[in-house]
């Protein structure tokens, strides 16, 4: 497994066919959400204002790998499993009803409908227009609804390991500013808009350590494609949380490395178009920093930590996969930090069993390693392909109970 531990979801498909006794388990996606802080990215910022680069045109309109299932989020209060292959993963009418973790007290608000920025540390008075791909800032087109939902997925994926709510629902100013005392609700507004006077040649911009101020001090995202827009939101919010840039050698921004499914880059760099983007601790060659992104995100001043562990770390505390029909099982979960593993169990009759464990988002940060055990705890098989970030098995098994460990 890659040393980056931040997150992403591992989706898995479990399928099993049996000749007798227990009915055959047919192919089905089981998915886990991995929230680890594997490669943590960082770099020293020398200025208070932290810009992100402009993404190349068309650099990332299509995901390098499409695993189908989108991150489960709350749509108007109901947990919903979207599909990244759909034009509107969560339904067109739900674009501004999305929330990743609505019970969290800390908020990352993705603001797409325009914003009047005044009375904050930017020292300006600007009415920023709504996000637009076609120049019409009064109405959202189908393409814009689709783009917003898919950018939202990218940001949720990056912050899913943490107890913070990424949302397109306007929480109100009081939920974004920290008034001190007994106030436990605060966050940051990420304004997705058009480049305005004074912000030329920037894909996004933010103030360092602006998360938790007593004012609404937004970050701004000008990159607009699916992944560069999503990554820029995560990058600029990262600055608000206290993160510096991840550079490479003499370059301020790490551009990413590799190709295909295992291409990689740090969120606090500029890895536009790479398949895996992760938080980093600067443990890559020619790094310009040793900053531990995950530890800084979790610092006390920001007010939140990891999410709680959702599945057991041993066979004795494994979660039974849900049997949705006689032949289909289903499940999902979150790997929330570097040392977390999740155990799942299933029972099958004798015969062929196929297992597929995939990161959920189109571009994830979890490189899955999965291990299959029998009821005695003996390892049956392990999967950690070098040319992909998912894991799979195709085994002829005796009837009985089995366990899957996702790492």
Give short role names for the model-derived ranges:
Residues 1-59:
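Subset of Sec-pathway N-terminal targeting signals
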Residues 35, 110, 155, 238, ...:
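Residue-level detector of buried hydrophobic side-chain packing
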Residues 37-42, 114-117, 243-246, 272-275, ...:
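Acidic glycine-/aspartate-rich tracts in secreted/extracellular proteins
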Residues 42-137:
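Disordered inhibitory propeptide/activation segment of secreted metzincin zinc metalloprotease zymogens
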Residues 102-106, 113, 117-251, 257, ...:
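Active-site-proximal segment of zinc-dependent metalloprotease catalytic domains
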Residues 106, 119, 292-327:
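Predominantly extracellular/luminal regions of secreted and cell-surface proteins
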Residues 118, 325-407:
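Acidic, Ser/Thr/Pro-rich low-complexity intrinsically disordered segments
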Residues 258-289, 294:
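Post-HExxH zinc-binding segment in Zn-dependent metallohydrolases
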């Amino acid at each position: 497994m890659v040393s980056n531990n931040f997150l992403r979801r591992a989706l898995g498909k479990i399928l099993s066919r049996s000749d007798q006794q227990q009915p055959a388990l047919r192919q089905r996606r089981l998915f886990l959400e991995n929230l680890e802080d594997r490669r943590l990215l960082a770099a020293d910022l020398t200025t208070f204002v932290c810009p992100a680069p402009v993404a190349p045109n068309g650099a990332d309109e299509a995901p390098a790998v499409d695993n189908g299932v989108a991150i489960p989020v709350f749509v108007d209060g109901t947990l919903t499993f979207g599909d990244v292959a759909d034009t509107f993963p969560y339904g067109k009418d739900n674009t501004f009803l999305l929330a990743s973790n609505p019970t969290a007290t800390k908020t990352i608000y993705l603001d797409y409908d325009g914003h009047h920025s005044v009375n904050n540390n930017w020292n300006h008075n600007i009415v920023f227009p709504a996000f637009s791909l076609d120049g019409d800032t009064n109405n959202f087109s189908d393409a814009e609804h689709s783009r917003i939902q898919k950018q939202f997925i990218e940001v949720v994926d990056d912050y899913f390991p943490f107890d913070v709510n990424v949302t397109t629902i306007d929480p109100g100013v009081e939920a974004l500013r920290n008034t001190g005392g007994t106030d436990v609700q605060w966050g940051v507004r990420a304004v997705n808009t058009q480049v305005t006077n004074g912000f030329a040649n920037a894909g996004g911009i933010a103030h360092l350590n602006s998360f938790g101020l007593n004012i609404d001090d937004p970050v701004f995202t000008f990159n607009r494609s699916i992944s560069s827009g999503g990554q820029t939101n995560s990058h600029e919010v990262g600055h608000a949380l206290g993160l510096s840039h991840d550079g490479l050698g003499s370059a301020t921004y790490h551009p990413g490395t590799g190709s295909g499914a295992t291409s990689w880059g740090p969120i606090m760099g500029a890895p536009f178009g790479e398949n895996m983007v992760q938080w980093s601790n600067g443990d890559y060659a020619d790094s310009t920093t040793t900053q531990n992104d995950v530890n800084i995100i979790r610092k006390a001043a920001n007010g939140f930590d990891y999410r709680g562990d959702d599945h057991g770390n041993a066979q004795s505390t494994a979660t039974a996969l849900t049997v949705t029909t006689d032949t289909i099982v289903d499940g999902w979960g979150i790997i929330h930090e570097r040392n977390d593993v999740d155990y799942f169990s299933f029972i099958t009759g004798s015969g062929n069993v196929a297992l597929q464990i995939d990161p959920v988002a189109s571009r994830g940060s979890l490189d899955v390693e999965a291990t299959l055990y029998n009821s005695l705890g003996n390892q049956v098989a392990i999967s950690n392909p070098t040319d992909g970030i998912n894991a799979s098995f195709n085994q002829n098994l005796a009837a009985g109970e089995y366990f899957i460990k996702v790492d």
